[in-house]
């Protein structure tokens, strides 16, 4: 698999957005017909590299390393300076050299002509505008990814812009005044020195976007490897405009819903028994996942005894409820990530994911005697798009046993281990 591709037909060089443009200036949304934003929230790079070099060379790092060459006879070399690995060394004419690796690599570009060095550039984002794009459908995981974007900003001292859905911006912007936040349709790709995309990239066997698969290192830590920063997790700083306590008395939040059936805790009578346990201890139950009346499963037993937030409750309001809760009891999903982000103890009922998959919590509940961790097993062919997927035991009595065999007593013991809990 070649590490660098070369296209021999160079676009016509002309007036193109210069690096001096400030991506922090307000931008108006492009017309709907010209909005090239992908459904996942990723904006395509500018048609031509955005930075000007000597001898008519243009370059940037907005889709991996891109080097545009005018007419001439050039010797182009690209090197990964972290691993000291040569990636490309060839004599070419007019064209575009583009690396196949799109995640962060500290590229060195060297160009010779006529036996002399005419251009040299080592990646250096200090003081330069950098864009990090967050996949739109991964709101919870994006909270885990964001800490690595902050590490990238601090490591490279760049002018960071983060593109993400509006609910995430409302949650994160108050805590990070030195970072520019934009929704995907407001991205101006011609302004940036470098761009990186954080998301899940199924089928990326060439590791073009993610050098380490989420199944191996964790859904959030994969972003650390995409950005080349310390993989130790760090929750984001969440500053709420209204951080008052929503209830005077003690309460526990519950997030039992999931689009994936394998994520749900379907132990017969489990949620009802857990509700009685918490109520007897004096805790009110608040369903922060706004359970749908159209979904009938074991968690439906909570409908008549719990207070449920409205379906249109903003993320900032859900964060307020979670921050002041004694704990969240939930399954893997967006609201578990949100609880982690605001510092609430998370009793995470799991099974289909290995503990490496999500944030670290001492209150994870998993039964290792049951089938488990199929999401992390490449041979299991787990299908995220199939809401009823049980890759190992579909159609048998063992289907979804991973979470179902988590007992109420195991969850109770975990809850009692939380400091300050009176159960």
Swiss-Prot record:
Cofactor(s), names only, from the UniProt record: Fe(3+)
Entry keyword annotation includes Metal-binding: yes
Pfam families: Glyco_transf_9, TibC_1st
InterPro entries in the record: Aah/TibC-like (IPR030929), Glyco_trans_9 (IPR002201), TibC/BAHTCr-like_N (IPR049327)
Disruption phenotype: During infection of host cells, loss of actin tail formation. Loss of BimA polar localization resulting in even distribution of BimA on the surface of the bacterium.
Keywords: Cell inner membrane, Cell membrane, Cytoplasm, Iron, Membrane, Metal-binding
Entry note: cofactor: Binds 1 Fe(3+) cation per subunit.
UniProt xrefs under SUPFAM superfamilies: UDP-Glycosyltransferase/glycogen phosphorylase (SSF53756)
Topology in membrane: Peripheral membrane protein
Biased composition (Polar residues): 1-10
Family: Belongs to the glycosyltransferase 9 family.
Its job: Iron-binding protein which is required for the asymmetric polar distribution of the autotransporter BimA on the bacterial surface prior to its translocation into bacterial periplasm. Lacks heptosyltransferase activity.
Name of the protein in its database record: Inactive autotransporter heptosyltransferase BimC
Organism annotation: Burkholderia thailandensis (strain ATCC 700388 / DSM 13276 / CCUG 48851 / CIP 106301 / E264)
Classification lineage: Bacteria, Pseudomonadati, Pseudomonadota, Betaproteobacteria, Burkholderiales
Gene (UniProt): bimC
């Amino acid at each position: 698999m070649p590490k660098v591709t070369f296209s021999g037909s160079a676009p016509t060089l002309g007036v193109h957005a210069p690096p001096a443009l400030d991506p922090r200036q307000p931008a108006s949304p492009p017309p709907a017909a010209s909005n090239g934003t992908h459904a996942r929230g990723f904006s395509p790079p500018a048609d031509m590299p955005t930075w000007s070099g000597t001898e008519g060379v243009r370059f940037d790092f907005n889709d991996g390393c891109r080097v545009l060459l005018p007419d001439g006879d050039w010797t182009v070399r690209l090197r990964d300076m972290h691993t000291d690995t040569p990636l490309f060394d060839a004599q070419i004419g007019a064209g575009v050299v583009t690396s196949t690796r799109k995640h962060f690599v500290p590229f060195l570009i060297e160009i010779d002509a006529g036996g002399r060095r005419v251009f040299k550039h080592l990646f250096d984002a200090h003081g330069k505008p950098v864009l990090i794009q967050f996949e739109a459908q991964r709101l919870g995981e994006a909270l885990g990814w964001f800490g690595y974007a902050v590490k990238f900003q601090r490591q490279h001292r760049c002018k960071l812009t983060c593109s993400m859905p509006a609910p995430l911006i409302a949650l994160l912007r108050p805590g990070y005044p030195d970072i520019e936040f934009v929704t995907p349709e407001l991205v101006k790709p011609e302004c940036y020195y470098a761009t990186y995309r954080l998301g899940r990239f199924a089928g990326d066997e060439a590791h073009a976007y993610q050098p380490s698969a989420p199944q191996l290192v964790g859904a959030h830590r994969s972003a650390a490897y995409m950005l080349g920063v310390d993989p130790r997790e760090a929750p984001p700083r969440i500053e709420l405009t209204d951080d008052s306590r929503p209830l005077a008395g003690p309460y526990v939040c519950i997030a039992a819903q999931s689009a994936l059936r394998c994520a749900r805790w379907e132990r017969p009578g489990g949620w009802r028994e857990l509700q009685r346990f918490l109520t007897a201890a004096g805790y009110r139950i608040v369903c922060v996942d706004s359970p749908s009346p159209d979904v009938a499963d074991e968690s439906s037993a909570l409908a008549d005894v719990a207070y449920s937030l409205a379906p249109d409750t903003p993320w900032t309001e859900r964060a307020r409820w979670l921050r002041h809760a004694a704990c969240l009891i939930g399954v893997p999903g967006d609201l578990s990530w949100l609880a982690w982000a605001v510092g609430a103890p998370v009793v995470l009922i799991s099974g289909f994911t290995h503990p490496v998959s999500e944030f670290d919590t001492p209150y994870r509940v998993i039964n290792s005697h049951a089938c488990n961790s199929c999401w992390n097993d490449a041979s299991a062919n787990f299908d995220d798009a199939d809401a009823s997927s049980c890759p190992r035991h579909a159609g048998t009595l063992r289907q979804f046993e991973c979470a179902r065999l988590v007992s109420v007593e195991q969850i109770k013991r975990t809850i009692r281990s939380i400091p300050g809990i009176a159960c």
